[in-house]
Design a protein with these regions (language model features):
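Alpha-helical elements of the RecA-like P-loop NTPase motor core of helicases
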Residues: 15-19, 76, 194
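Phosphate-bearing ligand-interacting subdomains
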Residues: 39-97, 101
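Structural signal for interior beta-strand "rungs" in well-ordered beta-sheet cores
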Residues: 94-210
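Short, glycine/charged-enriched secondary-structure capping and boundary segments
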Residues: 20-23, 44-47, 79-82, 108-109, ...
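A solvent-exposed beta-alpha-beta segment
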Residues: 2-67
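Short helix-capping segments at alpha-helix termini
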Residues: 24-25, 86-90, 194
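Flexible, glycine-rich phosphate/dinucleotide-binding loops
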Residues: 14, 37-38, 101, 209-211
Length: 211
């Protein structure tokens, strides 16, 4: 990572990212968080500098940002934060934990995050601002759209397509060749055996739609 990084957010997901960055010997200039009570505190030894307005003190040419907002509960906010700072000219660092296994031909979009123990097999493509969370397994030739979240322990079999801003919950399994549309939600532990349309929520074994 050629430039020092600024972490946006000081919550649980940000903490995991800071650990991954420190394990990769990245230089972290500080953390930004809107909570005034956190100003001056540290997250894993990294100082909280203040709220997002502090970012203007770091020109886009001198830092990269890392989106520390998690997807669960704040998916729209996470995307808004990414879009806001991209519009201001900032770039987002791609974070890959040293213990992750990523095939040499995998395409990782700007700001993609690949957490500890994850596996991404050959021919796969991961979009911008995605989270491939702890121990997720992405098999060959999968496509994960921008802003999607593949939660801890998820298994995507070969040739799966996941649409933009879709959430695949913890421990879910998706069999080979399945297509999941944009803004869909797959609940934790679901087993997906047929295609899922856009903006659809599914749960259960096998996965079925719910309101």
């Amino acid at each position: 990572m050629s430039l020092p990084v600024i972490m946006l957010g000081a919550g649980g997901h940000a903490k995991v990212l800071i650990d991954a960055l420190l394990e990769s010997s990245a230089v972290i200039a500080g953390v930004l968080d809107p909570d005034p009570d956190l100003a001056g505190a540290c997250v894993l030894g990294v100082p909280v500098l203040g709220n997002d307005s502090i970012a203007v003190e770091f020109p886009p040419s001198e830092v990269q940002l890392v989106n520390g907002l998690g997807s669960v509960g704040t998916p729209a906010r996470r995307r808004q934060l990414y879009d806001k700072f991209k519009a201001l000219g900032y770039g987002f660092a791609t974070v890959v934990h040293p213990s992750a296994i990523v095939a040499s031909d995998v395409v990782l979009g700007e700001g993609a995050q690949v957490m500890a123990g994850s596996i991404i097999q050959p021919g796969s493509s991961i979009g911008c601002n995605c989270i491939i969370n702890t121990r997720a397994s992405i098999d060959h030739d999968c496509i994960v759209g921008d802003h999607a979240h593949i939660a801890p322990g998820v298994t995507l079999s070969g040739g799966v397509s996941v649409g933009e801003a879709t959430h695949i919950g913890t421990g879910a399994i998706v069999i080979q060749g399945i297509s999941i549309g944009v803004n869909a939600v797959v609940a934790a532990g679901a087993v997906v055996v047929k295609d899922i349309p856009a903006r659809t929520k599914v749960r259960g074994v096998p996965a079925r739609e719910f309101a």
